[in-house]
Each structure stands twice: as structure tokens, then as C-alpha cells.
Regions:
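A non-catalytic alpha/beta surface segment that caps or lines the substrate-entry region
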Residues: 22-66
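Active-site metal-coordination/substrate-binding segment of hydrolases
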Residues: 62-125
Length: 125
């Protein structure tokens, strides 16, 4: 995936695909987002429902402009081909690039909404 542009987005997406995140089991991806916020000196809050809010101060000179809010969900649809052994609770997604298309080997990719999270992390980086 190193050849895909913009690199920062695809690097974040790949990292997210390596974190098991079935519905109702988002703790690992939640921890990843929290660590990302800390690493980038951003305010990160998790509410009682498990939603993660990461805030970034305005760029200098834009403090009085309207706020922008980006949203994505953390879990993924967990489906696999009948001939594939994969545990969505523990196994990372096997990502492949095929003629410029990003795919998963025998499972769902988790692009809904992993790519949304990746784009937001790129904006926050």
C-alpha cells in the first residue's frame, strides 16, 4: 500500500485494518484513536456510549471561523468467504492491492467506515 496516494491516508487506513473491530467490540480501535490523540497533543474524550471525540484547535488566524465536524463509525461489517478461516475478534484484515484496487483476502475490508477514520486522522495529523 506504500505506493498509494495520499500516503498518509492509506497508512492510517492500513493501521486501522490491522485492528479487530467487530460491532460491540470496538475497544481496541478506541484505544488506538485515544493514543493517536495523545501522540498529536489533541484533546480526546470518550463518552459513556464509547464514542470518541478528538478536537484540534483552529489554525492560527482562523479561530473565529465556523467549526468543522467530521464523523465516522468505528466498527466494521464482519463477513468472510466460506473457505476462509478468520476470527474477526482477533485477526487483522489481510489487505491486498490488485490493479490499484484495495481489497481484503477472503473477508470484508472494513472500508465502511475505516476509510472515514483514516481521512479524519490524516486531517488531524
Amino acid at each position: 500500500m506504500n505506493t498509494l496516494e495520499p500516503t498518509i491516508v492509506w497508512n492510517h487506513f492500513y493501521e486501522i485494518t490491522q485492528i479487530p473491530r467487530p460491532s460491540k467490540k470496538e475497544d481496541k480501535v478506541r484505544a488506538y484513536l485515544d493514543e493517536f490523540g495523545k501522540k498529536h497533543n489533541l484533546t480526546t474524550v470518550t463518552d459513556k456510549a464509547g464514542n470518541v471525540l478528538i478536537t484540534k484547535p483552529a489554525t492560527p488566524g482562523y479561530e473565529n471561523e465556523k467549526t468543522i465536524i467530521l464523523q465516522a463509525h468505528m466498527d466494521m461489517v464482519c463477513e468472510k468467504n466460506s473457505d476462509v478461516e478468520h476470527n474477526f475478534d482477533t485477526d487483522p484484515i489481510q489487505v491486498i492491492v490488485d490493479n490499484g484496487w484495495i481489497k481484503a483476502k477472503g473477508t470484508t475490508l472494513g472500508a465502511d467506515n475505516g476509510i472515514g477514520m483514516a481521512l479524519m486522522l490524516a486531517v488531524l495529523s
